[in-house]
Design a protein with these regions (language model features):
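Terminal helix/beta-alpha structural elements that buttress the NAD(P)+-binding lobe
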Residues: 1-202
Length: 202
């Protein structure tokens, strides 16, 4: 979806900016954007925005060309055509980016809402954006490629990401309601281990 859009864009996109860059969905997308950029010979930078606490971790993933903390967004080139992929759901942040880039945001795609605290904040201002709904894309692509074709492409993308992340993160398993509940409360306190992918079993 994003890769094809970047190829088809009337204006060459120079920056693809991902918010909540330390989240697994974001850096998975970033990995594929880097891979597709090289395969399609496109000329954009994949830039991750994250909290200052997560900046070093996110840089070490090697999924981005550049990683900035949220208080460093002024360093982004204002005169470059941008796509913004939002995984945070922080409207204030998006309004700031929209104001900073003025007419140089070619597309703003709302994908996730990892910033739970920001959901309580309802700032005034209109976002020129569109929603990405994964089930709709799965249905669309399955119709175009067939179930087997979709599964093959999905497996290929996942395999590439898994190999890249193999020495960077580990899998942690939690079994039973109490363990799952404890992990949930750890998440609410924003103390989850970024170096782990959690597998929950009941």
């Amino acid at each position: 979806y994003v890769g094809e859009g970047l190829v088809a864009s009337e204006q060459p996109v120079k920056q693809v900016i991902l918010t909540s860059a330390s989240s697994k969905t974001a850096y998975g997308a970033a990995h594929l954007l880097m891979k597709h950029k090289n395969e399609r010979k496109l000329d954009y930078q994949v830039i991750g925005l994250t909290s200052a606490n997560n900046k070093s971790f996110t840089q070490d993933l090697n999924c981005y060309d550049q990683v900035l903390s949220y208080d460093e967004i002024a360093e982004l080139g204002e005169d470059k055509v941008n796509w913004i992929l939002d995984f945070a759901g922080n409207k204030s942040l998006l309004l700031n980016l929209q104001n900073q880039f003025v007419n140089n945001i070619d597309k703003l795609i709302l994908i996730g809402s990892t910033d739970v605290d920001a959901q309580q904040d309802k700032p005034h201002g209109h976002l020129e954006s569109e929603f990405f709904f994964a089930p709709s894309q799965v249905k669309k692509r399955s119709g175009e490629w067939g179930h087997v074709g979709f599964s093959e492409r999905y497996a290929k993308a996942w395999h590439s990401f898994a190999i890249h992340m193999n020495d960077k993160i580990s899998v942690a398993e939690y079994s039973g309601a109490k363990a799952v509940e404890a992990l949930y409360h750890t998440g609410l306190k924003n103390k989850l281990n970024n170096l782990e992918i959690n597998v929950l079993k009941f």
